[in-house]
């Protein structure tokens, strides 16, 4: 009874692996990437450039663009893009159009993102959430919709970099909210453009050492948030809460942040070059072994574990 089942599972796994390894022929197709100043975007731009793709890399800052151009080949071109600015998006789209011409755009990688304030939700304002959503959710949506005609022209691919925290909201602030939103947009888009030959993949990295996870920046941002709180709210939590919270955050980040960004880049490259790209990729050991399994557990259990890990406010009622 069990032997046929086991053989069936092994056969399915073998066929899946064979299918997953099938690649498209080598290509010099055009790939547009956002957020190439540093981190995942910069690494991917350089790796695709080395593989012969014609990379159109957008950066937020002139220094980021100049630094990338300096170490890349002549095939790679850079432009400036602020994904929160509709006018900047329109200018970038025109720039892309002049490069791709009749060939269209084969790949769009929405990588630009920010962390915002990572901390208790009651400390934050609507504007705090808005700033993160503008970059992490509305930005990719705006860029994707603007470039969609060029992607349809080439029967191309959209790869949205979300986060494993788009599957499990482990902390307060706009980051998790923004990534959940981008996940939903990606799922809807995938179904809507599939009839036209456009493929959509989601890459949900675990914790990696990038500017988004820079501890000094995260701590400075949270301390500034604490400093602006009304005295009544500060009294509710107590002075010791912030110190303990930052200590826990530091311990977790030092323990699980992976310095090997190539794990993410390999997933992005597979999504662009595989004949059958996956719907979702989850690079990082913490994504596979911690966050994704936890996302399927009962909410009460996850809440209890997080309550045990994080410090309690001074005036807690339990």
Curated annotation (Swiss-Prot):
Substrate binds at residue 163. Residues 24-288 are lumenal. Residues 310-318 are cytoplasmic. Keywords: Endoplasmic reticulum, Lipid metabolism, Membrane, Microsome, NAD, Oxidoreductase, Sensory transduction, Steroid metabolism, Transmembrane, Transmembrane helix, Vision. Inhibited by 9-cis-, 13-cis- and all-trans-retinoic acids, with the most potent inhibitor being 13-cis-retinoic acid. Weakly inhibited by oleic acid. One of its GO terms (biological process) is steroid metabolic process. Gene3D superfamilies: NAD(P)-binding Rossmann-like Domain. Not glycosylated. Pathway: Cofactor metabolism; retinol metabolism. It holds the Pfam family adh_short. Its main location: endoplasmic reticulum. One of its GO terms (cellular component) is endoplasmic reticulum lumen. It is a multi-pass membrane protein. NADP(+) binds at residues 32-56. SUPFAM superfamilies: NAD(P)-binding Rossmann-fold domains (SSF51735). The keyword Magnesium does not apply. Catalyzes the oxidation of cis-isomers of retinol, including 11-cis-, 9-cis-, and 13-cis-retinol in an NAD-dependent manner. Has no activity towards all-trans retinal. Plays a significant role in 11-cis retinol oxidation in the retinal pigment epithelium cells (RPE). Also recognizes steroids (androsterone, androstanediol) as its substrates. The last 8 amino acids of the C-terminal tail are important for a proper localization as well as for the in vivo enzymatic activity. Belongs to the short-chain dehydrogenases/reductases (SDR) family. This is Retinol dehydrogenase 5. The lineage of its organism: Eukaryota, Metazoa, Chordata, Craniata, Vertebrata. The gene is RDH5.
């Amino acid at each position: 009874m069990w032997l046929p089942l086991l053989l069936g599972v092994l056969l399915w796994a073998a066929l899946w692996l064979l299918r997953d390894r099938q690649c498209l022929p080598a290509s010099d197709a055009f790939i547009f990437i956002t957020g190439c100043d540093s981190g995942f975007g910069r690494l991917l731009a350089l790796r695709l450039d080395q593989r012969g793709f014609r990379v159109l890399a957008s950066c937020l800052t002139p220094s980021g663009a100049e630094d990338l151009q300096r170490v890349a080949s002549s095939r790679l071109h850079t432009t400036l893009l602020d994904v929160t600015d509709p006018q900047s998006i329109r200018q970038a789209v025109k720039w892309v159009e002049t490069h791709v011409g009749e060939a269209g755009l084969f790949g769009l990688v929405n990588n630009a993102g920010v962390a915002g304030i990572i901390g208790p939700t009651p400390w934050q304002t609507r504007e705090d959430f808005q700033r993160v959503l503008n970059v992490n959710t509305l930005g990719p949506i705006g860029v994707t919709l603007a470039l969609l005609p060029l992607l349809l022209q080439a029967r191309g691919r959209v790869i949205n970099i979300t986060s494993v925290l788009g599957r499990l909201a482990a902390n307060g602030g706009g980051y998790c909210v923004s990534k959940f939103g981008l996940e939903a947009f990606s799922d809807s888009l995938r179904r809507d453009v599939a009839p036209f030959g456009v493929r959509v993949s989601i890459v949900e990295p675990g914790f990696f050492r990038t500017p988004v996870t820079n501890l000094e920046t995260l701590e400075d941002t949270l301390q500034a948030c604490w400093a602006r709180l009304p005295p009544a709210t500060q009294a509710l939590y107590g002075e010791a809460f912030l110190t303990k919270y930052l200590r826990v955050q530091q311990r977790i980040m030092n323990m699980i942040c992976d310095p090997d960004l190539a794990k993410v880049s390999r997933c992005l490259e597979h999504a662009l070059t595989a004949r059958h790209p996956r719907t979702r990729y989850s690079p990082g050991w913490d994504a596979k072994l911690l966050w994704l399994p936890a996302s399927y557990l009962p909410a009460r259990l996850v809440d209890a574990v997080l309550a045990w890990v994080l410090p309690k406010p001074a005036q807690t009622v339990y």
